[in-house]
């Protein structure tokens, strides 16, 4: 109230908490009868209770002399229930329905907020309720009548058969032994309705004596509702601060949460979803939807969500396929899980699903039989993969479920390029794991190219020819301009320039450089290897020998970032093939933010030059003639000097492998002892072998040179 004087205190009442009946006091409610019609004056014939379940049954007499009682109907019910012959087990011994049973049900499981109050001599005594039960008439006698009817019918059918029939033939009995019950089966059995019913039935009934409202025993028990020694010191429950007293009197309700309808564990409302962090929202949506365009994701998250933050979050849980986002395999198949169909581990499932996703980056269509042949997975697992992201078309195969999203591709080129780098790394991994033939595969996954079915083959060839002619003309003009500049150099008087023919070897080098393919397909990547139409080394007026890049290039931000990556990588790995280095570099690019300087395009030549400039050397491993290693896998680079005590040991080891493809351990150990002039311990030899080599079939190979 705004003015406390308008709300004066009329009376102060002491409140006491009585606990004598706290574990025994129940409140009975009769919802089918008005409060004015009580059962107090009706004879109670019997009472029983199951304390653990808080289940009560009361038997009350029916006034058969009441003019409203239908005697003929009562006799008929008694006859149906007990039959014509009365015995000790009869429900109605008087052959008349003269009693009815009331069975209880719990109204609430949380009664901590309820109490019975007794006001006496200016004091309010509260006793907590142990349970609140509603009693309704039970019609179990109808079940007994049905059972009697079925028994009579069975007896009649048995009586029709001949009395002179021979004894039944001996029947064979099959004995079965139950298998040991697993923990999951036991939990399912314990949670079943049948088990709960059996558990409830096992609890014995406790028979009670009923005392009427005015009985002396009832009067005696009613005294326990008063707190003993209310003026003494014992009753300290309510000697609390006002806030503590209010909390005790009205504790926070937990019942509302229990009463809410329980939704399935995999269902989450949009209201609940938006209370979660953004990253969790994206993960839950993608895990449930599997495939989604970016525009749809933004509409589900709400208009107030920043698209940049969503882009950052979606790349952690999904991959870009044809402009749409497909949930990552490790989200659907977490570690330590397995296939419900075949039981294969999650790692194998993720690899197979990644192959399906990668196939859809190449084409709109995928054939299930081809996927099963490559991945060696069962048909059910492959079908699950395809159903996540495709729809089946009769006599055609599986088509990607969503149309190509060209709008997203145009709007977010940085994200597209980053995803392309990730797919390049995944492709390299799939080629190695599944031993895919490189000739049958595209050279590189196109950076989320448009749908293949929209442009025919002739049109593609014509477009490619046109672009090649345009680029060739531009490069020719730039080359002529550079030649003109080189023809009139500033030569001091009296200086004669010696002219020598260009060696065929140099021409071949130039041709080889011109044929080298850059690692990316970005427009800026066209100039990473060619400067004004000339190879980098030639355009700058100096060749790149022994890994030293052209003057001026080492100081650029791109060169510095690239060198830092190369040095850090070789400090960890020591020996890498060019193929593995490119894969690690693509993964490094995928972890960088959009717009980073390294996205400008790095060619193979520039990467190799940076490796050699970082203190590494190329090891010319003599691969066997029948090797299946690609040219990039045959280029092996190793850290020559790292500044630690193992440099000399590592250099000796690398010299051994420059003359041998594979070596035995005893040969390595003897050579190390010979070159270093001392006997090396087993730990020192193990360290240098672990840094640079792998063991296979009793032989040691440089890392990356073993062909599976």
From Swiss-Prot:
<dbReference type="InterPro" id="IPR045576">
    <property type="entry name" value="RPC5_C"/>
</dbReference>
<feature type="modified residue" description="Phosphoserine">
    <location>
        <position position="503"/>
    </location>
</feature>
<keyword id="KW-0832">Ubl conjugation</keyword>
<feature type="modified residue" description="Phosphoserine">
    <location>
        <position position="161"/>
    </location>
</feature>
<feature type="cross-link" description="Glycyl lysine isopeptide (Lys-Gly) (interchain with G-Cter in SUMO1); alternate">
    <location>
        <position position="498"/>
    </location>
</feature>
<keyword id="KW-0051">Antiviral defense</keyword>
<feature type="region of interest" description="Disordered">
    <location>
        <begin position="146"/>
        <end position="170"/>
    </location>
</feature>
<keyword id="KW-0804">Transcription</keyword>
<feature type="modified residue" description="Phosphoserine">
    <location>
        <position position="522"/>
    </location>
</feature>
<dbReference type="GO" id="GO:0051607">
    <property type="term" value="P:defense response to virus"/>
</dbReference>
<feature type="cross-link" description="Glycyl lysine isopeptide (Lys-Gly) (interchain with G-Cter in SUMO2); alternate">
    <location>
        <position position="498"/>
    </location>
</feature>
<keyword id="KW-0399">Innate immunity</keyword>
<comment type="function">
    <text>DNA-dependent RNA polymerase catalyzes the transcription of DNA into RNA using the four ribonucleoside triphosphates as substrates. Specific peripheric component of RNA polymerase III (Pol III) which synthesizes small non-coding RNAs including 5S rRNA, snRNAs, tRNAs and miRNAs from at least 500 distinct genomic loci. Assembles with POLR3D/RPC4 forming a subcomplex that binds the Pol III core. Enables recruitment of Pol III at transcription initiation site and drives transcription initiation from both type 2 and type 3 DNA promoters.</text>
</comment>
<dbReference type="Pfam" id="PF04801">
    <property type="entry name" value="RPC5"/>
</dbReference>
<feature type="cross-link" description="Glycyl lysine isopeptide (Lys-Gly) (interchain with G-Cter in SUMO2)">
    <location>
        <position position="432"/>
    </location>
</feature>
<dbReference type="Pfam" id="PF19725">
    <property type="entry name" value="RPC5_C"/>
</dbReference>
<keyword id="KW-0597">Phosphoprotein</keyword>
<feature type="compositionally biased region" description="Acidic residues">
    <location>
        <begin position="502"/>
        <end position="519"/>
    </location>
</feature>
<dbReference type="GO" id="GO:0005829">
    <property type="term" value="C:cytosol"/>
</dbReference>
<keyword id="KW-1017">Isopeptide bond</keyword>
<keyword id="KW-0391">Immunity</keyword>
<protein>
    <recommendedName>
        <fullName>DNA-directed RNA polymerase III subunit RPC5</fullName>
    </recommendedName>
</protein>
<feature type="cross-link" description="Glycyl lysine isopeptide (Lys-Gly) (interchain with G-Cter in SUMO2)">
    <location>
        <position position="171"/>
    </location>
</feature>
<feature type="region of interest" description="Required for Pol III complex stability">
    <location>
        <begin position="556"/>
        <end position="708"/>
    </location>
</feature>
<dbReference type="GO" id="GO:0045087">
    <property type="term" value="P:innate immune response"/>
</dbReference>
<keyword id="KW-0539">Nucleus</keyword>
<dbReference type="GO" id="GO:0005666">
    <property type="term" value="C:RNA polymerase III complex"/>
</dbReference>
<keyword id="KW-0240">DNA-directed RNA polymerase</keyword>
<comment type="subunit">
    <text>Component of the RNA polymerase III complex consisting of at least 17 subunits: a ten-subunit horseshoe-shaped catalytic core composed of POLR3A/RPC1, POLR3B/RPC2, POLR1C/RPAC1, POLR1D/RPAC2, POLR3K/RPC10, POLR2E/RPABC1, POLR2F/RPABC2, POLR2H/RPABC3, POLR2K/RPABC4 and POLR2L/RPABC5; the stalk composed of two subunits POLR3H/RPC8 and CRCP/RPC9, forming a structural mobile part that protrudes out of the core and functions primarily in transcription initiation; and additional subunits homologous to general transcription factors of the RNA polymerase II machinery, POLR3D/RPC4-POLR3E/RPC5 heterodimer and POLR3/CRPC3-POLR3F/RPC6-POLR3G/RPC7 heterotrimer.</text>
</comment>
<feature type="cross-link" description="Glycyl lysine isopeptide (Lys-Gly) (interchain with G-Cter in SUMO2)">
    <location>
        <position position="659"/>
    </location>
</feature>
<dbReference type="InterPro" id="IPR006886">
    <property type="entry name" value="RNA_pol_III_Rpc5"/>
</dbReference>
<feature type="modified residue" description="Phosphoserine">
    <location>
        <position position="192"/>
    </location>
</feature>
<dbReference type="GO" id="GO:0005654">
    <property type="term" value="C:nucleoplasm"/>
</dbReference>
<feature type="compositionally biased region" description="Basic and acidic residues">
    <location>
        <begin position="146"/>
        <end position="155"/>
    </location>
</feature>
<dbReference type="GO" id="GO:0006351">
    <property type="term" value="P:DNA-templated transcription"/>
</dbReference>
<feature type="modified residue" description="Phosphotyrosine">
    <location>
        <position position="224"/>
    </location>
</feature>
<feature type="modified residue" description="Phosphoserine">
    <location>
        <position position="162"/>
    </location>
</feature>
<feature type="region of interest" description="Disordered">
    <location>
        <begin position="485"/>
        <end position="552"/>
    </location>
</feature>
């Amino acid at each position: 109230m705004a003015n406390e004087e308008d709300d004066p205190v009329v009376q102060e009442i002491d409140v006491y908490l009585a606990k004598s009946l706290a574990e025994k006091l129940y409140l009975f409610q009769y919802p089918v009868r008005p409060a004015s019609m009580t059962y107090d004056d009706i004879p109670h014939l019997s009472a029983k209770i199951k304390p653990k379940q808080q289940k009560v049954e009361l038997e009350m007499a029916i006034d058969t002399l009441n003019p409203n009682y239908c005697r003929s109907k009562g006799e008929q019910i008694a006859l149906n229930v007990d039959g014509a012959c009365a015995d000790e087990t009869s429900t109605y011994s008087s052959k008349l329905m003269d009693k009815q049973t009331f069975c209880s049900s719990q109204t609430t499981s949380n009664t901590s907020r309820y109490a019975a109050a007794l006001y006496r001599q200016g004091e309010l005594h509260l006793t907590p309720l142990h349970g609140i039960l509603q009693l309704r008439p039970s019609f179990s006698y109808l079940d007994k009548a049905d059972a009697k009817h079925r028994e009579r019918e069975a007896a009649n059918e048995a009586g029709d058969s001949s009395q002179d029939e021979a004894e039944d033939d001996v029947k064979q009995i099959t004995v079965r032994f139950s298998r040991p019950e697993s923990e999951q089966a036991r939990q399912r059995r314990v949670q079943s309705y049948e088990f709960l019913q059996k558990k409830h039935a096992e609890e014995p009934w406790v028979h009670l004596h009923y005392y009427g409202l005015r009985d002396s025993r009832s009067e005696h028990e009613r005294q326990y509702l008063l707190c003993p020694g209310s003026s003494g010191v014992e009753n300290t429950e309510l000697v609390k601060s006002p806030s503590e007293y209010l909390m005790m009197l009205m504790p926070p309700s937990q019942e509302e949460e229990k009463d809410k309808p329980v939704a399935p564990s995999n269902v989450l409302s949009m209201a609940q979803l938006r209370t979660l962090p953004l990253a969790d929202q994206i993960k839950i949506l993608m895990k449930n939807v599997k495939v989604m365009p970016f525009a749809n994701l933004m509409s589900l998250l709400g208009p107030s969500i920043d698209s940049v933050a969503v882009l950052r979050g979606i790349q952690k849980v999904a991959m870009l396929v044809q402009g749409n986002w497909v949930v990552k395999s490790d989200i659907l198949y977490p570690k330590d899980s397995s296939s419900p169909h075949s039981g294969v581990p999650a790692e194998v499932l993720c690899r197979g699903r990644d192959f399906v996703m990668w196939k859809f980056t190449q084409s709109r269509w995928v054939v299930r039989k081809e996927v099963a042949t490559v991945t060696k997975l069962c048909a059910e697992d492959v079908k699950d993969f395809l159903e996540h992201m495709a729809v089946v078309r009769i006599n055609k195969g599986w088509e990607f479920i969503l149309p190509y999203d060209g709008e997203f591709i145009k709007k977010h080129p940085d994200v597209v390029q980053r995803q392309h780098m990730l797919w390049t790394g995944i492709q390299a991994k799939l080629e190695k794991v599944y031993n895919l033939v490189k000739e049958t595969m595209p050279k590189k996954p196109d950076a989320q190219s448009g749908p293949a079915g929209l442009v025919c083959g002739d049109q593609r060839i014509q477009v490619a020819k046109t672009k090649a002619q345009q680029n060739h003309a531009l490069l020719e003009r730039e080359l002529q301009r550079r030649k003109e500049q080189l023809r009139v150099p500033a030569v001091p008087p009296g200086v004669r320039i010696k002219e020598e023919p260009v060696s065929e070897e140099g021409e071949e080098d130039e041709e080889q450089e011109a044929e080298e393919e850059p690692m990316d397909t970005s427009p800026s990547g066209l100039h990473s290897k060619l400067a004004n139409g000339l190879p980098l080394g030639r355009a700058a007026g100096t060749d790149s020998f022994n890994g030293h890049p052209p003057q001026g290039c080492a100081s650029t931000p791109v060169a510095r970032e690239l060198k830092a990556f190369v040095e850090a990588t070789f400090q960890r790995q020591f020996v890498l093939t060019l193929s593995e280095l490119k894969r690690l570099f693509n993964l490094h690019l995928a972890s960088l933010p959009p717009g980073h300087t390294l996205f400008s395009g790095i060619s193979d030549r520039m990467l190799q030059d940076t490796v050699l400039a970082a203190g590494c050397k190329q090891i010319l491993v003599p691969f066997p003639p029948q090797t299946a290693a690609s040219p990039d896998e045959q280029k092996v680079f190793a850290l020559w000097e790292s500044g630690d005590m193992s440099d000399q040991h590592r250099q000796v080891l690398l010299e051994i492998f420059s003359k041998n493809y594979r070596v035995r351990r005893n040969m390595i150990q003897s050579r190390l002892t010979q070159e270093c002039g001392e006997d090396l311990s087993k730990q020192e030899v193990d360290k240098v072998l672990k840094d640079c080599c792998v063991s296979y079939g009793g032989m040691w190979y440089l890392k990356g040179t073993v062909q599976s």
